[in-house]
């Protein structure tokens, strides 16, 4: 990942990192708006997922997960930022005039050519069925159902491995370590998803975190008792239960019944 350097005039530019190769000006015919309801709230407005809310408005980019432009070569024109995922996307211009977005493969640069279909070269960014791939191939954007489009290994830095083929099925080792068997007629893209160092990227300031729709995380012991089961009153010792209920869950207290001792005198 190429890092763009700034003159350190403020703490945010001194500590933040920005990829200099990535643009953020999508094509109008490949984007559309989407409705965002209350972040982290249910239909009644109650918090169901903490530390979420706000964030910048997002436009959804139409990503080609099917890769159904068969045997038509395409060229990478731009590498762009997508606010809806942590991986980058790249704009492809195909030979028949079609323009589509795909996930950016690691190591792909502007000007590279890609193609999808059967018996295409085993090259980074090419999409082909698992039956045409040799064992040990690193792949991403893997189909589960034939023709539905890639559903596995799509996050930044994700990569799976083809470890076996037997009969009508192929065995994959997924990024989570799970070993899964799918139809070997399903297609996948060769290589690893780009933006591998996304977890090492420094945002530089709290405001950048809020743009992503992430709110501050506050410890329960510093809250008031009305706000959290672990909250305490000022001036009192912080003695709390060992395993308290989560925030917002009503405690069901059971009445303690004293056990009596029955003594029978004969």
From Swiss-Prot:
<dbReference type="GO" id="GO:0005762">
    <property type="term" value="C:mitochondrial large ribosomal subunit"/>
</dbReference>
<feature type="compositionally biased region" description="Polar residues">
    <location>
        <begin position="7"/>
        <end position="24"/>
    </location>
</feature>
<dbReference type="InterPro" id="IPR022671">
    <property type="entry name" value="Ribosomal_uL2_CS"/>
</dbReference>
<dbReference type="Pfam" id="PF00181">
    <property type="entry name" value="Ribosomal_L2"/>
</dbReference>
<dbReference type="GO" id="GO:0003723">
    <property type="term" value="F:RNA binding"/>
</dbReference>
<dbReference type="InterPro" id="IPR005880">
    <property type="entry name" value="Ribosomal_uL2_bac/org-type"/>
</dbReference>
<dbReference type="InterPro" id="IPR012340">
    <property type="entry name" value="NA-bd_OB-fold"/>
</dbReference>
<keyword id="KW-0687">Ribonucleoprotein</keyword>
<dbReference type="GO" id="GO:0032543">
    <property type="term" value="P:mitochondrial translation"/>
</dbReference>
<comment type="similarity">
    <text>Belongs to the universal ribosomal protein uL2 family.</text>
</comment>
<dbReference type="InterPro" id="IPR014722">
    <property type="entry name" value="Rib_uL2_dom2"/>
</dbReference>
<keyword id="KW-0934">Plastid</keyword>
<protein>
    <recommendedName>
        <fullName>Large ribosomal subunit protein uL2c</fullName>
    </recommendedName>
</protein>
<dbReference type="InterPro" id="IPR022669">
    <property type="entry name" value="Ribosomal_uL2_C"/>
</dbReference>
<keyword id="KW-0150">Chloroplast</keyword>
<dbReference type="InterPro" id="IPR008991">
    <property type="entry name" value="Translation_prot_SH3-like_sf"/>
</dbReference>
<feature type="region of interest" description="Disordered">
    <location>
        <begin position="1"/>
        <end position="24"/>
    </location>
</feature>
<keyword id="KW-0689">Ribosomal protein</keyword>
<dbReference type="Pfam" id="PF03947">
    <property type="entry name" value="Ribosomal_L2_C"/>
</dbReference>
<dbReference type="InterPro" id="IPR002171">
    <property type="entry name" value="Ribosomal_uL2"/>
</dbReference>
<comment type="subunit">
    <text>Part of the 50S ribosomal subunit.</text>
</comment>
<dbReference type="InterPro" id="IPR014726">
    <property type="entry name" value="Ribosomal_uL2_dom3"/>
</dbReference>
<dbReference type="GO" id="GO:0016740">
    <property type="term" value="F:transferase activity"/>
</dbReference>
<dbReference type="GO" id="GO:0003735">
    <property type="term" value="F:structural constituent of ribosome"/>
</dbReference>
<dbReference type="GO" id="GO:0009507">
    <property type="term" value="C:chloroplast"/>
</dbReference>
<dbReference type="InterPro" id="IPR022666">
    <property type="entry name" value="Ribosomal_uL2_RNA-bd_dom"/>
</dbReference>
């Amino acid at each position: 990942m190429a890092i763009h350097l700034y003159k350190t005039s403020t703490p945010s530019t001194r500590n933040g990192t920005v990829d200099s190769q990535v643009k953020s000006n999508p094509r109008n015919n490949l984007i559309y708006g989407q409705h965002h309801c209350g972040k982290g709230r249910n239909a009644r407005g109650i918090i169901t997922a903490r530390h979420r809310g706000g964030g910048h408005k997002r436009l959804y980019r139409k990503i080609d997960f099917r890769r159904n432009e068969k045997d038509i070569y395409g060229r990478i024109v731009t590498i762009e930022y997508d606010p809806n995922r942590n991986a980058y996307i790249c704009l492809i211009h195909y030979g028949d005039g079609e323009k589509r977005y795909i996930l950016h493969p690691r190591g792909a640069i502007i000007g590279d050519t890609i193609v999808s279909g059967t018996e295409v070269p085993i090259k980074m960014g090419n999409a082909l069925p698992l039956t045409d791939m040799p064992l040990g191939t690193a792949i991403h954007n893997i189909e589960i159902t034939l023709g539905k489009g890639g559903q596995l290994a799509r996050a930044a830095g994700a990569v799976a491995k083809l470890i076996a083929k037997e009969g009508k099925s192929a065995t994959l080792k997924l990024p989570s370590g799970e070993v899964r068997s799918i139809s070997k007629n399903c297609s996948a893209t060769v290589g690893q998803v780009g933006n591998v160092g996304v977890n090492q990227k420094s945002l530089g300031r709290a405001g950048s975190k809020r743009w992503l729709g992430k709110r501050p995380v506050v410890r329960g012991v510093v809250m008031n008792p009305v706000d959290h089961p672990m909250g305490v009153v000022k001036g009192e010792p912080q003695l709390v239960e060992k395993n308290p209920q989560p925030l917002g869950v009503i405690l069901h207290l059971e009445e303690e019944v004293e056990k009596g001792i029955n003594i029978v005198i004969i």
